[in-house]
């Protein structure tokens, strides 16, 4: 007996209690603000995780559920990831700098540049409002640019910002 579990549009069973067939229950055990889900995948159905409205799974780790409450489209570094992009601030509006970076890289969170000067140069060239700098010591002079903010004190990977925990020092030459 179908009992309403069959999705007419796809011809698949898409209920978390009947995912792909009768009594094929999607496992739970997710963290807060998350629940089991069932979705079409090609010609079959697969179990997954669905976030509660207003919550986002930033790190794709079900064990901690949907860990980020979406608060705003825009975000400035203030200790809270308000737009749930995985960065305290707005990743789409920033250039990233890390001691492990390379000035030949594009300045993204996974390919940061090495110097603050290069970060400022890129921000000006491609119209980014912020430069986010991981904690550490950076050599070289910098020239601030109009309309570009520089924020230090970021953790490795840029997920968190605390200027006391991840001190950032720029040593001019």
Where are these regions (language model features)?
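Membrane-associated feature with strongest affinity for ZDHHC
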Residues: 1-101, 107-114, 118
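Glycine-rich repeat segments that build the extracellular carbohydrate-interaction surface of secreted
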Residues: 95-99, 114-139, 148-155
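Extracellular/periplasmic catalytic domains that process cell-envelope and extracellular macromolecules
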Residues: 90, 124-125, 143-145, 162-164
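Right-handed parallel beta-helix/beta-spiral solenoid domain characteristic of secreted/periplasmic
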Residues: 148-173
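Short active-site-adjacent helix-start/loop capping segments
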Residues: 139-142, 158-160
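Glycine-centered low-complexity coil/loop motifs and glycine-rich tracts
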Residues: 102, 130, 171-173
């Amino acid at each position: 007996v179908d009992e309403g579990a069959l999705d007419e549009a796809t011809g698949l069973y898409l209920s978390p209690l009947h995912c792909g067939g009768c009594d094929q229950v999607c496992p739970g055990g997710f963290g807060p603000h998350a629940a089991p889900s069932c979705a079409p995948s090609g010609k079959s159905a697969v179990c997954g995780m669905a976030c509660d409205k207003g919550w986002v799974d930033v790190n794709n780790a079900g064990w901690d559920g949907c860990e980020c409450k979406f608060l705003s489209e825009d975000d400035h570094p203030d200790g809270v990831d308000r737009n749930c992009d995985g960065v305290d601030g707005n990743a789409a509006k920033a250039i990233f700098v890390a001691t492990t970076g390379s000035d030949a890289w594009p300045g993204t969170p996974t390919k940061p540049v090495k110097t603050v000067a290069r970060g400022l140069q890129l921000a000006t060239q491609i119209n980014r409002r912020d430069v986010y700098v991981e904690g550490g010591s950076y050599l070289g002079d910098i020239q601030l640019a109009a309309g570009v903010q520089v924020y230090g004190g970021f953790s490795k990977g840029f997920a968190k910002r605390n200027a006391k925990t991840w001190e950032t020092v720029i040593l001019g030459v």
